Amino acid sequence: MIIKKNIKRAEFIKRPNRFQAYVKVDNEEIMVHVPNTGRCKEILIPGTTVVLREESNPTRKTKYDLIGGYKNGKFINIDSQIPNKVVEEALKLGNIKKLKKYNIIKREKTYGNSRFDFKLGNDSGEEYYLEVKGVTLEDGGVTKFPDAPTERGTKHILELIDVKNKGIGAGVLFLIQMKDVKYFTPNIEMDKNFSEALVSAHKAGVDIFAYECDVDEDFITLKKEVKVIL
């Protein structure tokens, strides 16, 4: 997908809370919105080059969203709103091999008491629930999720197990918001419960996908599947 709004580089200064950061742009220090509640501390380092997307909503307090940054010369998109859009585009194009048979794609659908990112279906009546997680944490080519403890994420995985146990298709897709990575693995050091839930999901037959992206400052698209090590 193409990011059609204006893009601008800036120098990262500090992040006083999850939602706000200060950057230097055109020799002026300004406050920007951070559309990611994760830590991103390996990317948002003082002095680092970051990328801003200009927003036009007149009711906003900030003019820009901070959508990514450079780490060792590699651009990483950190916008938490992007993964679902990228995956929806890939589903419609048939670029996720195992899910190509589903031609009905619905966003934000519930099953029981659970709400999942996608409900997929086809003309044969088959159903499949898919949850998407954006991945921004990378170390030496190894990508991990989560970068902060996530009770909500663990709940999603356990709910997918319940769906699968009822005979319905279920999967989680980790969208790695960068390119040229080695593999994906759960971040057990950060969140043991999530990591154990993911292993349990795999054993229960829930599909565990990881895809890296082709990404630059003004575009991002699902590229190729990446090995998952549990």
UniProtKB/Swiss-Prot annotation:
InterPro entries: SfsA, SfsA_C, SfsA_N. It comes from the Bacteria. Pfam families: SfsA, SfsA_N. One of its GO terms (molecular function) is DNA binding. NCBIfam families: sfsA (TIGR00230). Belongs to the SfsA family. PANTHER family: SUGAR FERMENTATION STIMULATION PROTEIN A. This is Sugar fermentation stimulation protein homolog. The gene is sfsA.
